[in-house]
Amino acid sequence: MSGGLDVLQMKEEDVLKFLAAGTHLGGTNLDFQMEQYIYKRKSDGIYIINLKRTWEKLLLAARAIVAIENPADVCVISSRNTGQRAVLKFASASGATPIAGRFTPGTFTNQIQAAFREPRLLVVTDPRADHQPLTEASYVNIPTIALCNTDSPLRYVDIAIPCNNKGAHSVGLMWWMLAREVLRMRGTISREHPWEVMPDLYFYRDPEEIEKEEQAAAEKATTKEEYQGEWTAPVAEFPQAEVADWSEGVQVPSVPIQQFPAERPEIPAAKPAAEDWSSQPASTDDWSAAPTAQASEWTGTTTEWS
Protein backbone atom coordinates (compact mmCIF):
# COMPACT_ATOMS: atom_id res chain seq x y z
CA MET A 1 0.00 0.00 0.00
CA SER A 2 2.97 2.34 0.41
CA GLY A 3 3.66 2.17 -3.32
CA GLY A 4 7.32 1.28 -2.81
CA LEU A 5 8.19 4.84 -1.75
CA ASP A 6 10.90 5.17 0.87
CA VAL A 7 9.09 8.13 2.42
CA LEU A 8 6.05 5.99 3.26
CA GLN A 9 8.03 3.02 4.53
CA MET A 10 7.84 2.11 8.20
CA LYS A 11 10.84 3.45 10.12
CA GLU A 12 12.79 1.59 12.75
CA GLU A 13 11.64 3.94 15.49
CA ASP A 14 8.02 3.21 14.56
CA VAL A 15 8.67 -0.54 14.85
CA LEU A 16 10.22 -0.01 18.28
CA LYS A 17 7.16 1.93 19.38
CA PHE A 18 4.88 -0.86 18.18
CA LEU A 19 6.90 -3.50 20.01
CA ALA A 20 7.15 -1.45 23.21
CA ALA A 21 3.38 -0.88 23.31
CA GLY A 22 2.57 -4.52 22.49
CA THR A 23 0.69 -3.69 19.29
CA HIS A 24 1.82 -6.95 17.69
CA LEU A 25 0.31 -9.12 20.43
CA GLY A 26 -3.14 -10.43 19.58
CA GLY A 27 -5.46 -12.76 21.43
CA THR A 28 -5.76 -16.52 21.80
CA ASN A 29 -8.81 -16.63 19.52
CA LEU A 30 -8.75 -15.98 15.79
CA ASP A 31 -11.48 -14.85 13.42
CA PHE A 32 -11.34 -16.48 9.99
CA GLN A 33 -11.30 -13.07 8.28
CA MET A 34 -8.27 -11.98 10.33
CA GLU A 35 -6.05 -14.89 9.28
CA GLN A 36 -4.45 -12.82 6.52
CA TYR A 37 -3.03 -10.40 9.11
CA ILE A 38 -1.44 -13.06 11.35
CA TYR A 39 2.31 -13.64 11.26
CA LYS A 40 2.76 -16.59 13.67
CA ARG A 41 1.37 -18.18 16.78
CA LYS A 42 3.33 -18.41 20.03
CA SER A 43 3.67 -21.53 22.13
CA ASP A 44 1.26 -20.12 24.73
CA GLY A 45 -1.47 -19.69 22.08
CA ILE A 46 -1.17 -15.93 21.49
CA TYR A 47 -1.25 -14.85 17.85
CA ILE A 48 1.36 -12.38 16.58
CA ILE A 49 0.10 -9.70 14.20
CA ASN A 50 2.14 -8.80 11.12
CA LEU A 51 3.18 -5.19 11.70
CA LYS A 52 3.81 -4.68 7.98
CA ARG A 53 0.12 -5.23 7.30
CA THR A 54 -0.72 -2.97 10.22
CA TRP A 55 1.35 -0.14 8.72
CA GLU A 56 -0.19 -0.57 5.27
CA LYS A 57 -3.72 -0.45 6.62
CA LEU A 58 -2.80 2.55 8.76
CA LEU A 59 -1.71 4.48 5.67
CA LEU A 60 -4.89 3.45 3.84
CA ALA A 61 -7.05 4.69 6.72
CA ALA A 62 -5.14 7.98 6.83
CA ARG A 63 -5.74 8.46 3.09
CA ALA A 64 -9.46 7.85 3.56
CA ILE A 65 -9.61 10.42 6.37
CA VAL A 66 -7.68 13.02 4.38
CA ALA A 67 -10.04 12.54 1.42
CA ILE A 68 -12.90 14.08 3.45
CA GLU A 69 -12.99 17.82 2.69
CA ASN A 70 -14.53 18.86 6.01
CA PRO A 71 -12.66 17.28 8.96
CA ALA A 72 -15.76 17.61 11.15
CA ASP A 73 -17.56 15.08 8.93
CA VAL A 74 -15.24 12.37 10.32
CA CYS A 75 -16.73 10.79 13.45
CA VAL A 76 -14.40 8.96 15.86
CA ILE A 77 -15.96 6.74 18.52
CA SER A 78 -14.73 4.83 21.56
CA SER A 79 -17.09 3.37 24.13
CA ARG A 80 -14.26 1.72 26.08
CA ASN A 81 -12.27 3.64 28.67
CA THR A 82 -8.91 2.75 27.15
CA GLY A 83 -9.66 4.67 23.96
CA GLN A 84 -11.66 7.67 25.14
CA ARG A 85 -8.70 9.91 25.87
CA ALA A 86 -7.04 8.91 22.58
CA VAL A 87 -10.23 9.69 20.65
CA LEU A 88 -10.48 13.15 22.20
CA LYS A 89 -6.82 13.87 21.46
CA PHE A 90 -7.20 12.67 17.87
CA ALA A 91 -10.25 14.88 17.40
CA SER A 92 -8.44 17.94 18.74
CA ALA A 93 -5.46 17.29 16.45
CA SER A 94 -7.34 16.47 13.24
CA GLY A 95 -10.61 18.38 13.70
CA ALA A 96 -12.85 15.29 13.75
CA THR A 97 -16.06 14.90 15.78
CA PRO A 98 -15.50 12.71 18.88
CA ILE A 99 -18.01 10.51 20.69
CA ALA A 100 -16.34 9.27 23.89
CA GLY A 101 -18.39 7.05 26.12
CA ARG A 102 -21.81 5.55 25.51
CA PHE A 103 -23.14 5.84 21.96
CA THR A 104 -26.79 6.91 21.91
CA PRO A 105 -28.76 4.54 19.66
CA GLY A 106 -30.33 6.35 16.74
CA THR A 107 -27.62 9.01 16.44
CA PHE A 108 -27.16 8.19 12.74
CA THR A 109 -30.72 7.06 11.93
CA ASN A 110 -33.21 8.94 14.14
CA GLN A 111 -33.60 12.48 12.80
CA ILE A 112 -35.87 13.56 15.64
CA GLN A 113 -33.33 13.44 18.45
CA ALA A 114 -31.03 16.38 19.13
CA ALA A 115 -27.84 14.31 18.84
CA PHE A 116 -28.55 13.35 15.23
CA ARG A 117 -25.46 13.39 12.99
CA GLU A 118 -24.72 12.63 9.37
CA PRO A 119 -20.98 11.89 9.18
CA ARG A 120 -19.24 10.91 5.98
CA LEU A 121 -16.71 8.58 7.66
CA LEU A 122 -16.75 6.56 10.87
CA VAL A 123 -13.70 5.40 12.87
CA VAL A 124 -14.22 3.06 15.84
CA THR A 125 -11.82 1.62 18.41
CA ASP A 126 -13.31 -1.86 18.87
CA PRO A 127 -15.83 -3.46 16.45
CA ARG A 128 -17.18 -5.67 19.22
CA ALA A 129 -17.72 -2.92 21.78
CA ASP A 130 -18.82 -0.35 19.16
CA HIS A 131 -21.22 -2.63 17.29
CA GLN A 132 -24.15 -0.18 17.56
CA PRO A 133 -22.55 2.66 15.53
CA LEU A 134 -21.27 0.13 12.98
CA THR A 135 -24.75 -1.29 12.50
CA GLU A 136 -26.32 2.16 12.12
CA ALA A 137 -23.56 3.20 9.70
CA SER A 138 -24.49 0.25 7.50
CA TYR A 139 -28.09 1.53 7.38
CA VAL A 140 -27.10 4.97 6.04
CA ASN A 141 -24.13 3.86 3.87
CA ILE A 142 -21.32 5.38 5.94
CA PRO A 143 -17.84 3.90 5.29
CA THR A 144 -16.18 2.62 8.45
CA ILE A 145 -12.63 2.16 9.78
CA ALA A 146 -11.92 -0.01 12.83
CA LEU A 147 -8.99 -1.08 14.99
CA CYS A 148 -9.37 -4.87 14.91
CA ASN A 149 -7.84 -7.56 17.08
CA THR A 150 -7.38 -11.19 16.06
CA ASP A 151 -10.84 -12.13 17.36
CA SER A 152 -12.75 -9.01 16.19
CA PRO A 153 -15.73 -9.48 13.85
CA LEU A 154 -15.25 -7.67 10.54
CA ARG A 155 -18.94 -7.32 9.73
CA TYR A 156 -19.78 -3.80 8.45
CA VAL A 157 -16.06 -2.87 8.63
CA ASP A 158 -14.61 -1.46 5.40
CA ILE A 159 -11.00 -0.80 6.49
CA ALA A 160 -9.64 -3.00 9.28
CA ILE A 161 -6.38 -1.99 10.98
CA PRO A 162 -4.97 -5.14 12.66
CA CYS A 163 -3.56 -4.34 16.09
CA ASN A 164 -3.98 -4.99 19.78
CA ASN A 165 -7.09 -3.00 20.69
CA LYS A 166 -7.22 -4.29 24.29
CA GLY A 167 -4.12 -2.70 25.78
CA ALA A 168 -4.21 0.95 26.82
CA HIS A 169 -0.75 1.68 25.41
CA SER A 170 -1.44 -0.07 22.12
CA VAL A 171 -4.74 1.76 21.53
CA GLY A 172 -3.19 5.12 22.41
CA LEU A 173 -0.22 4.50 20.12
CA MET A 174 -2.45 3.51 17.18
CA TRP A 175 -4.54 6.68 17.47
CA TRP A 176 -1.32 8.72 17.78
CA MET A 177 0.10 7.07 14.65
CA LEU A 178 -3.14 7.68 12.75
CA ALA A 179 -3.24 11.35 13.79
CA ARG A 180 0.40 11.83 12.79
CA GLU A 181 -0.12 10.28 9.33
CA VAL A 182 -3.24 12.38 8.75
CA LEU A 183 -1.37 15.58 9.59
CA ARG A 184 1.56 14.53 7.41
CA MET A 185 -0.66 13.83 4.41
CA ARG A 186 -2.42 17.15 4.87
CA GLY A 187 0.93 18.90 4.96
CA THR A 188 0.47 20.25 8.47
CA ILE A 189 3.66 18.65 9.77
CA SER A 190 6.80 17.56 7.93
CA ARG A 191 8.03 13.99 7.59
CA GLU A 192 11.62 15.13 8.03
CA HIS A 193 11.08 16.28 11.61
CA PRO A 194 9.53 14.27 14.46
CA TRP A 195 6.12 15.28 15.76
CA GLU A 196 6.44 17.28 18.97
CA VAL A 197 3.36 15.60 20.50
CA MET A 198 4.32 12.55 22.56
CA PRO A 199 2.33 9.28 22.42
CA ASP A 200 1.97 9.40 26.21
CA LEU A 201 -0.75 12.03 25.85
CA TYR A 202 -2.95 9.47 24.07
CA PHE A 203 -2.56 6.78 26.74
CA TYR A 204 -5.39 5.97 29.11
CA ARG A 205 -4.71 6.74 32.78
CA ASP A 206 -6.56 5.12 35.64
CA PRO A 207 -8.31 7.72 37.87
CA GLU A 208 -7.06 5.91 40.98
CA GLU A 209 -3.47 6.20 39.80
CA ILE A 210 -3.96 9.89 39.02
CA GLU A 211 -5.39 10.45 42.50
CA LYS A 212 -2.46 8.63 44.11
CA GLU A 213 0.01 10.74 42.15
CA GLU A 214 -1.76 13.93 43.19
CA GLN A 215 -1.75 12.87 46.84
CA ALA A 216 1.94 12.01 46.67
CA ALA A 217 2.70 15.38 45.10
CA ALA A 218 0.65 17.19 47.78
CA GLU A 219 2.41 15.32 50.61
CA LYS A 220 5.78 16.11 49.09
CA ALA A 221 4.88 19.79 48.88
CA THR A 222 3.71 19.91 52.52
CA THR A 223 6.84 18.19 53.81
CA LYS A 224 8.96 20.61 51.83
CA GLU A 225 7.12 23.59 53.34
CA GLU A 226 7.55 22.19 56.87
CA TYR A 227 11.24 21.62 56.30
CA GLN A 228 11.70 25.18 55.09
CA GLY A 229 9.55 26.54 57.93
CA GLU A 230 11.82 25.09 60.62
CA TRP A 231 14.74 27.13 59.36
CA THR A 232 12.90 30.30 58.46
CA ALA A 233 10.75 30.61 61.65
CA PRO A 234 13.39 32.43 63.80
CA VAL A 235 13.94 34.97 61.07
CA ALA A 236 10.23 35.72 60.91
CA GLU A 237 9.97 36.22 64.70
CA PHE A 238 12.68 38.91 64.87
CA PRO A 239 12.48 41.09 61.80
CA GLN A 240 14.89 43.96 61.48
CA ALA A 241 12.11 46.54 61.35
CA GLU A 242 11.19 45.90 65.01
CA VAL A 243 14.65 46.96 66.25
CA ALA A 244 13.94 50.53 65.22
CA ASP A 245 10.67 50.47 67.22
CA TRP A 246 12.50 49.42 70.40
CA SER A 247 14.94 52.31 70.10
CA GLU A 248 12.09 54.74 69.60
CA GLY A 249 10.25 53.56 72.74
CA VAL A 250 13.24 54.16 75.08
CA GLN A 251 13.61 57.77 76.24
CA VAL A 252 17.25 58.77 76.05
CA PRO A 253 18.22 62.09 77.72
CA SER A 254 19.66 64.57 75.35
CA VAL A 255 23.28 65.23 76.27
CA PRO A 256 25.28 67.78 74.36
CA ILE A 257 28.19 66.26 72.59
CA GLN A 258 31.51 67.95 73.29
CA GLN A 259 33.60 68.39 70.24
CA PHE A 260 37.32 68.02 70.88
CA PRO A 261 39.87 69.40 68.50
CA ALA A 262 41.66 66.88 66.39
CA GLU A 263 45.15 68.43 66.80
CA ARG A 264 46.88 68.71 70.19
CA PRO A 265 48.72 72.06 69.62
CA GLU A 266 45.37 73.85 69.59
CA ILE A 267 44.47 72.78 73.18
CA PRO A 268 45.67 76.07 74.85
CA ALA A 269 42.86 77.88 73.05
CA ALA A 270 40.55 76.95 75.96
CA LYS A 271 42.18 79.49 78.38
CA PRO A 272 39.58 82.23 77.89
CA ALA A 273 36.96 79.84 79.23
CA ALA A 274 38.97 79.42 82.46
CA GLU A 275 39.14 83.18 82.85
CA ASP A 276 35.35 83.32 82.63
CA TRP A 277 35.08 80.86 85.50
CA SER A 278 37.51 82.90 87.63
CA SER A 279 35.41 86.02 87.16
CA GLN A 280 32.66 84.57 89.36
CA PRO A 281 34.11 85.35 92.84
CA ALA A 282 32.14 88.59 92.84
CA SER A 283 29.03 86.56 93.31
CA THR A 284 30.68 84.52 96.06
CA ASP A 285 31.22 87.71 98.05
CA ASP A 286 27.49 88.29 98.01
CA TRP A 287 26.93 84.82 99.44
CA SER A 288 29.48 85.39 102.19
CA ALA A 289 27.97 88.73 103.15
CA ALA A 290 24.59 87.29 103.99
CA PRO A 291 25.75 84.82 106.63
CA THR A 292 27.68 87.50 108.49
CA ALA A 293 24.61 89.63 108.83
CA GLN A 294 22.56 86.72 110.07
CA ALA A 295 25.19 85.78 112.56
CA SER A 296 25.13 89.27 114.09
CA GLU A 297 21.40 89.09 114.42
CA TRP A 298 21.57 85.74 116.20
CA THR A 299 24.26 87.02 118.47
CA GLY A 300 22.16 89.99 119.33
CA THR A 301 19.35 87.81 120.48
CA THR A 302 21.61 85.74 122.61
CA THR A 303 22.81 88.79 124.44
CA GLU A 304 19.25 89.73 125.16
CA TRP A 305 18.50 86.29 126.75
CA SER A 306 21.55 86.50 128.81
Curated annotation (Swiss-Prot):
It is found in: Cell membrane; Cytoplasm; Nucleus. The modification N-acetylserine is found at residue 2. Residues 161-180, 205-229, 242-306 are annotated as: Laminin-binding. Keywords: Acetylation, Cell membrane, Cytoplasm, Membrane, Nucleus, Receptor, Repeat, Ribonucleoprotein, Ribosomal protein. Disulfide bonds: none annotated. Belongs to the universal ribosomal protein uS2 family. This is Small ribosomal subunit protein uS2. The lineage of its organism: Eukaryota, Metazoa, Chordata, Craniata, Vertebrata.
